[in-house]
Amino acid sequence: MAVGVSPGELRELSDDELIERLRESKEELFNLRFQMATGQLSNNRRLRVVRQEIARVYTVLRERELGLASGPAGEES
C-alpha cells in the first residue's frame, strides 16, 4: 500500500475497492500491532499512517452513505 493515500484518490475508487482497501489496511494494522508486541517493529510511524488510512476509507464510505458524495465518475452508489 502506498504511504499516505489522499482522500481524493480514495473517492475515485468504487465501494467494492474501498472495502477491499479497508480489509487490507486492517490486516496490515493487525500485523503491525503483533510486531510491536513482539518487539520486531522498526517503523512506529507506520501504525499511525495505517490507522489514518482506515479512518479516511471509513469517511469516504460514510459520505456516500449520507449522500454527501457520489461514487467514482459521479455514479451514485
Swiss-Prot record:
CDD domains attached to this UniProt entry: Ribosomal_L29_HIP (cd00427)
Superkingdom: Bacteria
GO molecular function: structural constituent of ribosome
UniProt-listed PROSITE patterns: RIBOSOMAL_L29
Keyword set includes Glycosyltransferase: no
InterPro entries: Ribosomal_protein_uL29, Ribosomal_uL29, Ribosomal_uL29_CS, Ribosomal_uL29_sf
SUPFAM superfamilies: Ribosomal protein L29 (L29p) (SSF46561)
Keyword annotations of the record: Ribonucleoprotein, Ribosomal protein
GO-annotated cellular components: cytosolic large ribosomal subunit
Single Gene Ontology BP annotation: translation
Membrane-spanning parts: none
Record-stated family: Belongs to the universal ribosomal protein uL29 family.
NCBIfam families: L29 (TIGR00012)
Protein name in the entry: Large ribosomal subunit protein uL29
